[in-house]
Design a protein with these regions (language model features):
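Conserved ATP-driven helicase/translocase motor core recognized via long
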Residues: 2-8, 33, 64, 98-100, ...
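Conserved ATP-dependent motor core of P-loop NTPases, especially the RecA-like helicase ATPase domain
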Residues: 12, 19-30, 62, 69, ...
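Active-site-adjacent bridging/hinge elements
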Residues: 42, 49-51, 121-130, 156-163, ...
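Core structural elements
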Residues: 142-157, 210-235, 411-418, 437, ...
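Conserved helicase/translocase P-loop NTPase motor core
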Residues: 147-154, 180-184, 411-460, 473, ...
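C-terminal accessory regions
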Residues: 702, 710-714, 840-843, 872, ...
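Extended active-site and interfacial segments that coordinate phosphate-rich ligands
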Residues: 859-890
Length: 1002
């Protein structure tokens, strides 16, 4: 039986944010923008450092360099480019040996060294012989240089120090998410079964938390919430300790406060909650006060008028009351003495506004009357909103907060217990997650001898794509560079798009801001990728949208600068930016179509707004690449989108018109027909008495419905056994009947030969080898290759073999365990389909995330009008990071969370103000991430950028598209320069890229 282990908050659980690097490793930072060549600059710095540290004849090998990047593919690309740069630097030094700067034989026209006037080129030319020697040695040593991801580097450190760590010998890493989720699921299954037992000490706490998920029927929601919080905690240096203060927002007493907002002992969540209302209400309430003062100024009986407008002035003073009175006192003003009851008695709002008073009369058609009418309409909603916020007494709110805190504490306990049991399960299976390896590596680097050895091995550390690192990875970088001679960090906060992995772009921004020494800081804003028209457009959009409060950077300080000398003197291209919007209004005239005989037919199939947008994009691609005025090749066009929902439809429509396509990750691997056929083969090999997969396999072998019916009529029992008896009897039936077709008997015999061969092979070979054998004897691999998109389908079959091999190494051996795992992976959607084989001249279709680091002549941003920011509406518990200062003065980070209280028995749901505040902040963070995604998408284009979306015109638009109407609702902040961050998140509809772009332009 699993027992409860309390998760008590401890000071040592804090994530200490000691961003102060040791004096000898104050980082060198390269802060860059898109298309400015930041990785190129990093490679040049590596070569320059290598020359400088060998200047005094002291040998310093390139093996002392450690290069860290974000992905395995990026690491391979850096190694390739570094090899090219070394080869070119050697050639540059050899060809220019003895030359004066003005008469060089070989010019650096491609800027591999940064140009002939760069510091690297000048250093090479200062002593060409020395440069040749240094770079030649470095080129020979390059294969041994550590260029890798943090995950791979952590694994290396752990492997070399395993004897000092709690590591299971021979452990395997759960690199496949599906396999990881399988082991997690098994652990959760066992825990939930024990927690449902009333005798378990965790039962009451478990059921209390489960009640907030609407009861046992929704325990899947609890599992999802636990795993979401668990994954977030694993990106923090303090692991589960990051969750220890999750309930902190609920740990205070409202009834003891003398004032609701701004009190000495107040609560920041309470202040934020009501400050938002004050910010919204102050202007309309000030306008109401102005109207009252104007009316009183012309009144003949001021004393009586003052008496008659007391209740109205009380409404105007509500912000002041929130700052000076207790919760219950303010509540009495807006609930007990309901001003909404008084308001209609004093002011009638219709075509005109009349202030009802014995002493005051406002003319119906006066300017004051119209102002009063407009103001009162808004005030009703404002007062009603405050009433909803103060619906409960302070004592009731405190009671609700106690329940919320208790449930969050219970959730922490459940996650802590899971963490312990999951650790045991991983130990028993001899497996580990990447996060486990990272924490082991951090533990190893805390040991003095290990730290000393690492410091001696890697003296010069270079980190690329720093904006995508999470808190745990940033801690790793600080630890591994503690004894280094130099640390260089490269990144662009504007391109941080991995919030779903809990990336922390703000931390890299803070590091950049902390580096005040100009010699340690370099800024790259000159864009060499895009034409000036695109650069100007991008700057215009993001100068208003991206601010320190929305996007984590001040774009005006980092805006792109035009750097393409090739564009000098060229005329302005008005078509470099296109807005491609499909009219999503229903075409009523096409609802019923009559054929030539007068018979009504169904409306056109392609009528959905997303289908219309796909068709519009297909037509535009044809126009760009076909006909006498074609300027681009298919391979020069990329279609990018936030998600892959409509990729299959787009690829299909492009294929239909003869346009080649390269799609990355479209659809679910386990739903592809070739994979289903392979799995059905495995199922009947594992257990031949499964008629459904057997029939599916037989159909692929050419069996018709008539053939299957004849087999079934032949005898009763399992279909496979019937076929075996038919083959053994030569087609004779038990009742003196024979199969009418020798062809059918031949089909059965051929199938059984293949089946028996596959079974015999599978008994003595590994699962992955058995799959390759099955592909060969059944002809499945060739069959898939001859289907439409054959290369992609064969890639899917290869991926299934890889998954089978990885499963056998990291999990259980055997066919049936693998099939059980596949069933679970398929149900959970854990299988992304393999991409198509890269094609030189094909339209590229991919998500914005996968496009990072790439570029094309033409980029089409698809789905720019799709809704964003849906996450805050689905999560049962939302969290934000909260920094505090410990007793020793160190800054620590914890997670703080909030939820909506649910009473499943009474079917009651109460939204807490803490949840409202955290939801608001979380939506702002989501919006900032989406802004950065939009920036990445728009900066992939070299010559043409096309924004594609759809729009449904309003009733007053006469069915026509109106750009100003499309952008209606977005507002400028008080400085008139940037967009108010709140309007980026909150508007009349759900935010989308098209809304933001048009709002920033109009």
């Amino acid at each position: 039986m699993v027992e409860h282990v309390d998760a008590l908050p401890r000071s040592e659980d804090a994530d200490i944010l000691s961003d102060d690097f040791p004096t000898n490793t104050m980082p060198y930072v390269i802060s860059a923008s898109a298309g400015t060549g930041k990785t190129t600059q990093l490679l040049q710095d590596i070569l320059l450092d290598l020359l400088n540290r060998n200047a005094d004849e002291a040998h310093s090998s390139i093996r002392e360099s450690l290069i860290i990047t974000f992905t395995v593919a990026a690491a391979a690309e850096i190694r390739r480019r570094l090899e090219q740069n070394l080869q070119y630097a050697i050639l540059y030094a050899r060809r220019n040996h003895g030359c004066q700067p003005g008469s060089l034989v070989l010019l650096d026209t491609d800027y591999q060294l940064g140009g002939d006037d760069s510091e690297l080129a000048r250093t090479i030319l200062h002593d060409c012989h020395h440069a040749q020697t240094v770079f030649s040695v470095a080129l020979n040593d390059l294969p041994t240089v550590q260029i890798s991801t943090i995950d791979a580097l952590s694994k290396r450190i752990v492997d070399r120090n395993a004897d000092t760590l709690p590591v299971t010998p021979g452990f395997q890493i759960l690199a496949d998410d599906a396999m990881k989720n399988r082991l997690r699921g098994q652990t959760l299954d066992a825990l939930f079964e024990s927690w449902y037992d009333e005798r378990n000490s965790m039962h009451a706490r478990f059921m209390d938390v489960l009640d907030n998920m609407q009861g046992p029927r929704h325990d899947g929601d609890l599992r999802a919430t636990m795993m979401s919080l668990y994954d977030k905690a694993l990106t923090k240096p303090n692991r589960i300790g990051w969750l220890s203060r999750l309930a902190e927002p609920y740990r205070f007493n409202i009834a003891s406060l003398n004032q609701v907002v701004g009190g000495e002992y107040g609560n920041e969540y309470l202040d934020r909650y009501f400050q938002g209302w004050i910010d919204m209400a102050e202007h309309p309430l000030a306008e109401l006060r102005s109207c009252l003062d104007e009316a009183l100024a012309s009144c003949h009986d001021a004393h009586t008028a003052q008496q008659d407008t007391v209740s109205l002035r009380m409404i105007c003073d509500l912000p002041q009351y929130l700052r000076s009175e207790s919760w219950n006192a303010v509540r009495a003003r807006v609930i007990d003495a309901n001003p909404l009851d008084v308001l209609p008695k004093r002011i009638t709002v219709g075509k005109t506004a009349i202030l009802k008073s014995t002493a005051i009369a406002v003319p119906k058609d006066s300017e004051l009357g119209r102002r009063l009418a407009e103001t009162v309409r808004g005030i009703k909603g404002i007062v009603s909103d405050l009433q909803s916020k103060l619906a409960f007494t302070a004592e009731q709110v405190d009671s609700l907060d106690e329940v919320a805190a208790r449930r969050l504490e219970g959730l922490i306990s459940l996650i802590t217990t899971f963490d312990q049991q999951y650790a045991l399960a991983k130990q028993q299976e001899s497996v580990a997650e990447f996060s486990d390896v990272a924490f082991w590596a951090l533990d190893a680097m805390q040991q003095p001898d290990v730290a000393k050895r690492i410091g001696a091995q890697w003296r010069y550390i270079y980190v690329d794509e720093c904006q995508d690192n999470n808190a745990l990875q940033n801690r790793f970088i600080r630890e591994i560079s503690r004894n280094a001679a130099k640390l260089t960090m490269v990144g662009d906060v504007k391109q941080s798009i991995y919030g779903f992995r809990d990336a922390s772009p703000e931390e890299f921004g803070d590091i950049c801001n902390s580096v005040t020494d100009a010699s340690h800081r370099r800024e790259l804003w000159v864009n060499y990728r895009s034409v000036p028209e695109i650069i100007t457009f991008v700057n215009t959009v993001f100068a208003r949208l991206m601010t320190p409060n929305m996007g984590a950077t001040d774009y005006l300080k980092e805006q792109l600068q035009i750097g393409s000398a090739k564009q000098a003197g060229k005329p302005f291209d008005a078509e470099a930016i296109e807005l491609l919007v499909s009219n999503a209004a229903p075409d009523l005239s096409a609802d019923v179509v009559a054929d030539e005989n007068g018979t009504d037919t169904a409306p056109p199939v392609r009528a959905d707004k997303d289908e219309l947008q796909v068709d519009m994009i297909v037509r535009r691609v044809q126009e760009l690449c076909e006909g006498p005025h074609a300027q681009y090749s298919y391979g020069g066009i990329a279609v990018l989108a936030r998600g892959a929902t409509h990729f299959a439809d787009l690829a299909d429509r492009l294929y239909r018109v003869g346009i080649p396509v390269e799609v990355q990750g479209v659809g679910d691997l386990y739903r592809q027909p070739e994979i289903q056929i392979a799995l059905d083969w495995l199922r009947i090999i594992s257990n031949r008495h499964q008629d459904v997969p057997l029939v599916a396999v037989l159909r692929t072998m050419g069996f018709t419905d008539d053939d299957l019916a004849r087999i079934r009529l032949h005898n009763r029992g399992w279909l496979f056994d019937v076929m075996r008896r038919i083959a053994e009897s030569g087609g004779e039936a038990d009742e003196s009947t024979v199969l009418s077709s020798d062809v059918l008997l031949a089909k059965i015999s051929a199938f059984l030969r293949i089946y028996d061969a596959a079974c015999d092979y599978a008994r003595v070979h590994s699962l992955s080898d058995s799959l390759w054998h099955l592909y060969a004897v059944s002809g499945l691999f060739d069959f898939a290759g001859n289907m439409p998109e054959g290369e992609r389908r064969q890639a899917n079959l290869r991926l299934l073999v890889e998954k089978a091999g990885a499963f056998a190494v990291a999990q259980e051996r055997g066919l049936q365990p693998f099939l059980d795992a596949v069933t679970m992976w398929s149900a959970s959607g854990s299988g992304e389909e393999a991409s198509t084989v890269p094609t030189k001249n094909a339209v590229h279709i991919m998500t914005i995330h996968k496009s990072k680091g790439l570029q094309w002549p033409v980029v089409i941003l698809m789905g720019a009008s799709n809704n964003l920011l849906t996450g805050s509406r689905t999560a049962a518990v939302r969290t934000i990071a909260h920094q505090t200062r410990n007793e020793d003065g160190a800054v620590a980070e914890y997670g703080e969370g909030a939820l909506s209280l649910v009473d499943q028995r009474n079917h009651v749901r109460v939204d807490t103000f803490q949840r409202a505040v955290i939801d608001s902040r979380a939506k702002e963070l989501e919006a900032a991430e989406e802004l950065r995604l939009l920036y990445v998408a728009m900066t992939r284009a070299e010559r043409k950028l096309i924004i594609a979306g759809s729009y449904r015109p309003g009733k007053n638009d006469d069915g026509n598209l109106n750009l100003r109407t499309m952008a209606q609702g977005i507002a400028l902040s008080g400085d008139g320069r940037t967009i108010d961050p709140r309007t980026v998140v909150k508007n009349s509809g759900s935010p989308n890229y098209l809304y933001w772009i048009l709002g920033s332009l109009l």
